[in-house]
Structures are given as structure tokens and as C-alpha cells.
Amino acid sequence: MQVYSIQAILPVLMADFSATEVQAGMVVGATILAIAIMSPFLGMLSDAVGRKSFVVGALLFLTLPTALIAQSTTIEWIGLWRFLQGLSVPGITVVTIAYIGEEFEGRAVTELMSFYVSGSVLGGFMGRFLLGHLHELIGWRAGYYVMAAMTLLGALWVTKMLPVSRQFVANPNFRSAIQTLGSHLVNRYVVTACLLGACVLFSLVGCFTFINLYLADTPYHLGTGALANIFAVYLIGVIITPLSTILLRRFGSARTIIVAVIISMLGVLLTLATPLWLIVIGLGVMSSGVFVTQSATISYIAVNVKQGRSLASGLYYLFYYAGGTVGAWLCSLAYAYGQWQFTVWLLLFVQVLALLIASFGMIKTKSKAA
């Protein structure tokens, strides 16, 4: 919930701190940059010490900077606390993917990855929705205290409910981890998935960060509550993403991703329409295509990578969140230069790159699991 919740209140923060579009983009990108930096390292560390304890510890750490955002006096302080938030997130995301890949096999992995992505989608919606409406009720500062309390409760829930790993085998050998890293960097499955991941989050962050500024401005003038409601389009992804397993089993990862990216591009084009209802439909179509792409991509790794899964997941998330960081920055420049229309053309360019990667980079084997 914490990574993108700030998008719902960006127009308010820009007004409160007299921030520019580029500064707003970097506040969003700060968390994503930290996640990109830490993902492979936390992946290696988790391979050495375990899974459940890592997830719980990361959730507990995440509580602190979330609460400290409420004390920020400048946009730069918000950026710092957002960066610290990002340091803990890979301990949740990377390790969870490795946990699923180790504890389950075959079709179950693909299905659980789809449910994992659906949960991430739901969390992304809830973070933006809650913070947007909390701002209208009690202000964004108090809203962040509520978000911190919810994160703490989440840590306690995971402590009680998540089963201890049964299949985990510790690998404390750092030299072995480096060798595994080297093999991943020349593994076509891993490299292709990493490049696709970068394109996926570039598109998602660029679109859903700056559509807020666009809809808060003339002629729409949407407030934080209305902007938070826009993110309800994420809920379509909660339904569609698990259904994507049917496509994956029938057509394979590559074909599924190609179709999903094309659908996402059509959604981005729809946001150029003037009526608000068409823009909302476009966002729903765009995000659904992105979520199916992400689900297919991480399943592609989980099914085809047998050794060093946590490190492979870490590499994927390094590229995934690096793409989001670059997306926040480049789209901020595009929006500052040519408003939403220029941002759309940039998003379409990156999605064309994703099409090329899926078409020529992925190994097109149809698998019962992938």
C-alpha cells in the first residue's frame, strides 16, 4: 500500500510545498529507486538466512518512515522518508516470490503468482484510495499515521499466519551467490523478464502519477477524494489477473504478454479523449494489460529458474523498479514540457519496446505451468 499511495495527494503536496512537476516525480521515484537498489542484495541475504523472518522484519521497518512522512516540513524530507520506505519493500516482495517458488510446484506456482499480483494490485488501490480520502477527512499528515498503524498490524498478522518455510535451503556462501548472480545475468529467461519488468513499471508509474496532475487541472479540477476514486480501476486487475492463468496455460507467456501489451497501449490512447468517463475506461484497460504482463513475467521466472530464486527475483525487481524510477523522472520532464499528450507518446514508445522484447526475446515454449 505504501509505495504509490502518495500519488493520490501529489497535487496537494505540490501546493503545500510549492513543488514542481519534476520534484513531484522524484518524490514518487525515491521509493522506487531504493527498491531497485536493494532488491538483489536483500534477495541474496534472504537466500542465506530465510524467508518468513525477513518479511516480518521488513514490514516492521516500513512502519517507521511511513510515520515520519507526517512530520515532513519540506518536499525533500518527504523524498528522504520515501527512500527509506523503499529500502524495506524488497524484503516483502522479493522474498514472497521466492517463498512461493520454493513451497509450490507446477501449475500451483502460476496460479499463486497471479493471486500474488492481484494482492499487489489491491494493495496499490487501497493505498491510494485510503490516503486520498483520509486527507479529505483528517489531512494527509494524520493519514500517514493511520497508514503506519496499518503496516504494523500487517506485520503482526504475517507473524501469526504465514507458515514457516519447509523447502528453504540456506545458502550462506557469498562466493556461490556471486556465481549465481553471474549465471542469472546471462540467463535468457531472467534477462528478458527483467527488461519487460522495467517497461511494465515505467508505464504504470508514468501513467498513474501524472494523470493525477492532469485531472486536478483545468477542465476537470478533481480533488484528492475524486482522484482516489479513479484508482478503483485497479480493481479490474484484481479480477482479470487470476484469469490470465488460463491464457498462460493455453498460449504461453510470450503470446500472453504480447496481447496484454497491445491492450495496454489501446488504454493509454483512450486517455487522450476529453470526456472523463473515457479517460477512466482507458486507465482501466491500460492497468489491466500491465497487470497481466507482470503476472506472466514473474511466472516466467518462477517456472523457468530453478536455482537462486530469491536472487533472480531480486534482479527482476531491480530492473522493474529502476524502470519505475526512470519512468517517474522522464514522464515528469514530458509533462512539464508538453503536458499529458507528450506523456502519452512517451508511454507508448516504452510499450512498443516491451512488444519487441516479448516478440524477439522470450523463449516461446508452451508449458502447462507457464
Which residue stretches match the model-derived regions?
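Conserved MFS/SLC helix-loop-helix module at the cytosolic interface between two early adjacent transmembrane helices
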Residues: 37-76
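C-terminal transmembrane helical hairpin of 12-TM major facilitator-type secondary transporters
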Residues: 254-297
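Helix-loop-helix hairpin linking two adjacent transmembrane segments in secondary transporters
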Residues: 77, 106, 114-162
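Extracytoplasmic
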Residues: 1-21, 39-42, 207-213
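Paired small-residue
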Residues: 65, 76-84, 277-285
